[in-house]
């Protein structure tokens, strides 16, 4: 779309750092969530000019491969891979291009920087991500009678690390998870950072950041140019009771964003507190 072209200028393949690499893709927040928050998930992708080819986006692939091609020709693109250049979208697009011409049953191994070329925004048909969460990584070897020892070992390690995660239905890119005895909600917000921080500060002062009960807002982290607020939840909360409070909070945020005004001294202090509790993930 126009926004990502305006943000990133002519050099689609140069290695300048791109703050919001997924801007311009439908469901930018879901891309960020799958890269930073969700352990095991897939979503089908459609490549322009190869609409009949089965392509699946996956959070993680065996041995942290950037991409692989199953024996039946299905391409898997791994999202949680180490960035090589300054533009995550270009890195992923380069891996996808390699996978589309790779032999069935092979994996893509990155070599050096990808160099100039198309980004995901250029390769993919515009369509929202239809995310499927998985309890583990068995989808790697679905239909494979005897996965190799290396892949099997990688699968066992990955399965052991999976954090129980559920996606909320009422708003995009909001994910409940349980880590040991603790539960959290992490919610990737699509709004531009500066006005969003103002709105969050206003809600914080008005006690409007709660989700009811003993849920506690604990801060936010920045990922790929978007803010991800995090709430600490009492054990046993689960995802379902969060649906209504999260939709109510989204409405309060929308109201605050729609009526910007200078912050009061108290709100400015609250905004500084929000910033001091930020952590940036790339």
Locate the predicted segments by residue.
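N-terminal membrane-targeting/anchoring modules of bacterial envelope and secretion proteins
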Residues: 11-139
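Long, contiguous binding/interaction regions
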Residues: 37, 163, 279-282
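Surface-exposed beta-loop interaction hotspot
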Residues: 105-179
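A short acidic-to-branched-hydrophobic micro-motif
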Residues: 179-198
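Short acidic, Pro/Gly- and aromatic-enriched capping/linker segments at domain boundaries
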Residues: 200-219
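Alpha-helical oligomerization segments
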Residues: 214-282
